[in-house]
């Protein structure tokens, strides 16, 4: 049995108005990023809300950036986590899509304005009125949001997605709540742009830059689409992993000039998941005329854009951030049908700080998931 973490000695936070539901979480209180138990409050279940018992929560690299205040936007205490899966415990009177006992997930956002053009078009992840993120954000009622490193969340039904479950009696395939949790961020971050930009057509050739939390899921989706997929990495040691275990068709070491030259002009598209600053010129050279490269990573330094390579080849360089709720639900259903899930290391709540240290060193294959339901205790 996994070890447990309790909140017996944790400080009680003064609940905002209408935030009367008690919950327990793991919070960072300063830029050391060290997580300790804390008692927090959640709002009572509103008419359009879904209350969820959190069972699992994935650890995203953005969680690490935030708890350490590396983006200079942390408001402590921070209860991180936006790859949340669990079971519905209560629904509001206006909620018809969910019921108690349903297996569900919550991703990176929990509210938007609902009225701007992006929201009306079903692209709420680009809400011009401001996305309310699952944690370290300010909700419409002025309260701070706390994420999935906690035993319970209350979320508007608009931002909850259903997980196919064998317990539901349906004929379709189920998606595990533990290895499915990272899909709510890493999964939709690559799935949405692949679908939007036509990098989902069987027989076409797609490159995946980076073989980490996002990249390994991109490889799995590309294979499920029936595409030819080549991994592009700075790490030669990942060749065997990419080809033999993940089933990629090819592997290129990006610092190997001969390998890069041999692949020039062969790809219909590239999903670039790397966060390190990279050479756009060498990657664009891999594309066929009118090929597309989609950036989903956030480099630390501004990129140098080779305009002649873009214009001369009619190539497209685009960015993508997360995915909409409809895209997230579509992705979850597709993943269940095709057996796509993240490769995870399941950890107990008392192992989170060690996991963060390992994540900072890149020592994870490929995603940590916290077993909240079995290891985070309130007594």
Swiss-Prot record:
Keywords: Lignin biosynthesis, Metal-binding, NADP, Oxidoreductase, Zinc
Pathway: Aromatic compound metabolism; phenylpropanoid biosynthesis
GO function terms (MF aspect): cinnamyl-alcohol dehydrogenase activity; coniferyl-alcohol dehydrogenase activity; zinc ion binding
Top-rank taxon: Eukaryota
Ranges for region Disordered: 1-21
GO BP: any one term: lignin biosynthetic process
Swiss-Prot/TrEMBL cofactor(s): Zn(2+)
Name by which UniProt lists this protein: Cinnamyl alcohol dehydrogenase 7
Protein's organism: Oryza sativa subsp. japonica
Gene name as annotated: CAD7
């Amino acid at each position: 049995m996994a070890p447990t973490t309790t909140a017996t000695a944790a400080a009680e936070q003064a609940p905002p108005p209408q935030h009367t539901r008690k919950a327990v979480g793991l919070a960072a209180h300063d830029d050391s990023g060290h997580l300790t138990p804390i008692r927090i409050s959640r709002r009572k279940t509103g008419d359009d809300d879904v209350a969820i018992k959190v069972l699992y929560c994935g650890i995203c690299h953005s969680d690490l950036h935030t708890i350490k205040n590396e983006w200079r936007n942390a408001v402590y205490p921070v209860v991180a986590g936006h790859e949340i899966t669990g079971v519905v415990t209560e629904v509001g009177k206006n909620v018809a899509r969910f019921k108690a006992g349903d297996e569900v997930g919550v991703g990176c956002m929990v509210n938007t304005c609902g009225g701007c053009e992006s929201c009306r078009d079903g692209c709420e992840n680009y809400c011009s009125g401001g996305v309310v993120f699952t944690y370290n954000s300010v909700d419409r009622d002025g309260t701070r949001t706390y994420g999935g490193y906690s035993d319970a969340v209350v979320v508007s039904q608009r931002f909850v997605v259903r997980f196919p479950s064998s317990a539901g009696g349906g004929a379709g395939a189920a998606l595990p709540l533990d290895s499915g949790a990272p899909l709510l961020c890493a999964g939709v971050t690559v799935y949405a742009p692949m679908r939007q930009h036509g990098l989902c057509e069987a027989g076409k050739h797609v490159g995946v830059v980076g073989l980490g939390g996002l990249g390994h899921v991109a490889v799995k989706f590309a294979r499920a689409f029936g595409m030819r997929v080549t991994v592009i990495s700075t790490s030669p040691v990942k060749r065997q992993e990419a080809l033999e275990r993940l089933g990629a068709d090819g592997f290129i070491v990006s610092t190997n000039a001969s390998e890069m030259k041999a692949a020039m002009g062969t790809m219909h598209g590239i999903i670039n998941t790397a966060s390190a600053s990279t050479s756009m010129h060498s990657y664009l050279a891999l594309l066929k005329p009118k090929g597309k490269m989609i950036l989903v990573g956030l480099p630390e330094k501004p990129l140098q854009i080779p305009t002649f390579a873009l214009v001369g080849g009619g190539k497209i360089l685009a960015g993508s951030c997360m995915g909409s709720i409809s895209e997230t639900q579509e992705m979850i259903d597709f993943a269940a049908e095709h057996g796509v899930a993240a490769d995870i290391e399941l950890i107990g709540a008392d192992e989170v700080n060690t996991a963060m240290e390992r994540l900072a060193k890149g020592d994870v294959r490929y995603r940590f998931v916290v077993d909240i339901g079995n290891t985070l205790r309130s007594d």
